[in-house]
Swiss-Prot record:
Residues modified as N6-lactoyllysine: K6, K12, K16, K17, K21, K24, K44, K86, K109, K117, K121
PTM-bearing positions, type Phosphothreonine: T116
Record protein name field: Histone H2B type 1-M
SMART domains for this protein: H2B
Residue positions, PTM ADP-ribosylserine: S7
Modification N6-succinyllysine occurs at: K35, K117, K121
The organism of origin for this protein: Homo sapiens (Human)
Compartments in which it is found: Nucleus; Chromosome
Chain's gene name: H2BC14
InterPro entries attached to this UniProt entry: Histone-fold (IPR009072), Histone_H2A/H2B/H3 (IPR007125), Histone_H2B (IPR000558), HISTONE_H2B_site (IPR055333)
Residue list for modification ADP-ribosyl glutamic acid: E3
Sequence position, cross-link Glycyl lysine isopeptide (Lys-Gly) (interchain with G-Cter in ubiquitin): K35, K121
Sequence similarity: Belongs to the histone H2B family.
Modification N6-glutaryllysine occurs at: K17, K35, K44, K47, K109, K117, K121
Amino acid sequence: MPEPVKSAPVPKKGSKKAINKAQKKDGKKRKRSRKESYSVYVYKVLKQVHPDTGISSKAMGIMNSFVNDIFERIAGEASRLAHYNKRSTITSREIQTAVRLLLPGELAKHAVSEGTKAVTKYTSSK
């Protein structure tokens, strides 16, 4: 009767033989890819408006998605406007018009005034 073949011992969960997922074949750790988000800026604005209020990570994820969505919409509309006018550069004028087209009534007015204020502050600091 043939003897049963023994396989190599399986390393236990916490053993040193288990290979770390973040390690390459040569033993060096891989650098984690950086995830860009607006969370730092959302948090700064939150603290300006409501200093005693916090935000959950789920809510921060939603806010990040919202900012990305609005950014893409404005950029797309500004790009279209530049193309219609046979321009190769998106200026603050295209951005302002895109905001007026995308945002409703009073919200557009406030966004335009805040944007103008931010551009003025930026140009004066140069």
